[in-house]
Amino acid sequence: MSTSASFAKEAQRTHKLAVAGMLSAVAFVLMYIEFPIPALIPAFIKLDVSDLPELLAAFALGPVWGVVVTLLKNVLFAILHGTSSQYVGELCNFLLGSVFAFTAGLIYHRSKSRRSALLGAVAGAALMAVVSVPVNYFVVYPAYVVVYGMPMEAIIGMYQAIRPGADNLMKCLVTFNVPFTFCKGLLDVLLCFLIYKPLSPILHR
């Protein structure tokens, strides 16, 4: 490999690291900006757009970089903010965010068109919503019962206050969490498409 080619490759790697670091910092800040939607879903589940930077990273740098930003975001949050869930919430955020970003980036980078970007992002949001069911059912909610000492019946009761027919955890997750997670992903997709082009000079060399 020539010296110039080696230098160009190193410069590209440095640029990717810098962009990933910047997007991780932005994602970390966005984790603080969240709000409940109590009429639609229990108040302990909040809406945020902290998955947006990892989606940008997946498109601009590659699917693996989307996962890297997701990881760094949650590590920063756990270290600087602390955790009230024994890191269960951060683990859930990492798993679901990684599915979202990696899927979107993988599909986009196969053809790199606006259509593939949209297809990848929507597919990522849909897969994230589907994966949220086993992650919440087998990991997150049982862990919350242990960490907070709250009976599962009390958690289900919060869902039933909105929809009485949600009388078991699986019904709660399918009825509330899946559509909420999908719509949350679609919000990130919309914002990504609005800001990606203006940010392109920063994201790309």
Regions found by a protein language model. Name each.
Residues 1-205:
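Loop-helix junctions at membrane interfaces
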